[in-house]
Curated annotation (Swiss-Prot):
It comes from Arabidopsis thaliana. The gene is USPL1. The BURP domain located at the C-terminus has not been identified in non-plant proteins. It holds the Pfam family BURP. Disruption phenotype: No visible effect on seed development, but significant reduction of 11S seed storage protein content in the mature seeds. Enhanced drought tolerance. Associated with the protein storage vacuole formation. It comes from the Eukaryota. InterPro entries: BURP, BURP_dom. One of its GO terms (biological process) is seed development. This is BURP domain protein USPL1. One of its GO terms (cellular component) is Golgi stack. Expressed in cotyledons, radicle, floral buds, open flowers, roots and developing seeds, but not in leaves. Highly expressed in the root tips. Detected in young leaves, hypocotyls, stems and mature seed funiculum.
Length: 280
């Protein structure tokens, strides 16, 4: 049984995980921690501007109003290419810590210096890292553990609502997952007096969600955006992190927004495979 499970995970790793990692993975840009200071971002620049479309998800609090136009990239992973969500029983059979990296790479038949090996190391590093001041964070490795940890963080006796980003087009059109100019066609609606957790799907051989929130430091909005040609609409959550004073000074958001590090709120949209939990 154990060998069959190991082989099935390895097969999924080679076929699904490999395809996923080589594509742009937006969630990794939304995490406000890094393993070391001074990360080189020169590979993201072209002629002094950012050349990675997945970075076009950040905006400022002043942008959050009716009529504002922003260049945004909403990326959708092909669900058939996403690694599977394990049960708790399956996930508990596999260690999930950076200290077991060599074992895990061998378990999944992945080399350390491959894109997949580097992605595994990065995900484990983020999940093992201590929370920054005022932050609560965890990684869910199964549906059961994800729900349990969300309830533990937000309260066992509260009603929870799940929010995701949705892209909609008329039936005769296909969705274009590319950079588009989007305009706020309705005034963003703030969800007042709620708790929130943002859960970002991370690159790993099976589904892992990195969830984090900031105590009293985030504002959540429901937004309604439309492309210039009016053919594509996006509805979903946006969050503004009001206190960035403890963020890494090299966080890519400060560079994308061309702001002084830790000086002002940072807002962002969510990729389509991310989850936002809020109290009702």
């Amino acid at each position: 049984m154990a060998s069959t499970f190991r082989l099935s995970i390895s097969f999924l790793t080679l076929i699904l995980f490999s395809l996923w990692v080589v594509e742009a993975h937006t969630s990794r840009k939304l995490i406000s921690i890094k393993e070391k200071e001074g990360q080189d971002i020169s590979h993201l620049l072209k002629d002094g501007e950012f050349d990675d479309p997945s970075l076009y998800m950040y905006f400022t609090l002043n942008d959050l109003k009716l009529g504002t136009k922003l260049l945004i990239y909403f990326y959708k992973n092909d669900l058939q290419k996403l690694p599977p969500l394990l049960t708790r029983q399956q996930a508990d059979l596999i260690p999930f810590t950076k200290s077991k990296l060599d074992f895990l790479l061998d378990h999944f038949s992945i080399t350390k210096d491959s894109p997949q090996g580097k992605a595994i190391k990065e995900t484990l590093g983020h999940c093992d890292a201590k929370a920054i001041e005022g932050e609560h964070k965890f990684c869910g490795t199964s549906l059961e553990s994800l729900i349990d940890l969300v309830k533990k963080t937000m309260g066992y006796n509260v009603d929870l609502k799940v929010m995701t980003t949705k892209v909609m087009v008329p039936a005769q059109n296909s969705i274009s997952y590319a950079l588009h100019n989007y305009t706020f066609v309705e005034a963003p609606k703030e969800l007042v007096g709620i708790k929130m957790l943002g859960c970002h799907r991370m690159p790993y051989p099976y589904a892992v969600y990195y969830c984090h929130g900031h105590k009293g430091g985030s504002r959540v909005f429901e937004v309604n955006l439309v492309t210039d040609d009016g053919r594509q609409r996006v509805v979903g959550p946006a969050v503004c992190h009001m206190d960035t004073s403890t963020w890494d000074a090299d966080h890519v958001a400060f560079k994308v927004l061309k702001m002084e590090p830790r000086s002002a709120p940072v807002c962002h949209f969510f990729p389509l495979d991310n989850i936002v939990w809020v109290t009702k």
